[in-house]
């Protein structure tokens, strides 16, 4: 979808069509970072508050969010392609790829393929590691991740992070579907989210 308004202050986007990436600035910035001594770069994209479907493809939005305008695989593909652009422009610098959690129990398969193809040097797993903190151990022991432990990308962890109305100013975040400890916390947080 084209955006009619020019967006001259965006970063990594086509200023005349912001939904389209333009990797010239990010690739140049990574080069400058490398020259300054940076030894590792994590490639992420979007804003978790403005366009979370870009940064973390999801199955269901948080309670205060919006329906994703694209299939989550489009977002996963975007992460893979744009991270590969950076890694291939700077093959001597380890680039960390993100955006894998929606793939559930196929995270390690996709990560391994991207590492083998030189598209990324490392894979970071955020939401998926909250749902399944022992996924590396299970993968090393059995050769695969368990589907019934994997992140289902339904955004409860995101809602917990966004819910601020508590004495700590943020609710503890974890995987509500996979860890019963967070079920009551989510119920408490949900009351504050529906009031915002």
Question: What is each stretch, according to the model?
Answer:
Residues 1-196:
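Flavin-dependent oxidoreductase catalytic cores
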